[in-house]
């Protein structure tokens, strides 16, 4: 409720706000006639049931104890169930060895690593290197380049495939120079 404050009120201007609030007159409930006449219509009596605190605490404590012990049992059971048919991350049944021939989950042969670059099969027996002469998946010997075989099919007589274009260009220039030598300009 807003009330104009006069400037002559010294207590409001000089002292703190808490003293001003304490001096303010509060209106009682009796001043509102509407509330007094219809009090029974809007206000309901509040009844509290007496509940003993001891029984609630004992119920809560026993409930907490049983739930935590049950949770621990189920967690340990889940761990046991997870490890029943496997050993570790390999994905092979427990009791078998690597040499039994089980592949890893990625599909590469056992004994190979991801860094070796094997996806399913390397194209040569395991334990051999590229230098051993086994052909890689496209069917050509290791170290060969596709471009060399393509350049060889173009028909340039040069043995050096890297300089085939400049050689052909220089041949054309030499033939033009030779014709001018045979027929000097007069």
Swiss-Prot record:
Residues 60-140 are annotated as: Disordered. PANTHER family: UPF0461 PROTEIN C5ORF24 (PTHR31894:SF0). Pfam families: DUF5568. Belongs to the UPF0461 family. Residues 60-69, 94-107 have a biased composition (Polar residues). Residues 78-92 have a biased composition (Basic residues). This is UPF0461 protein C5orf24 homolog.
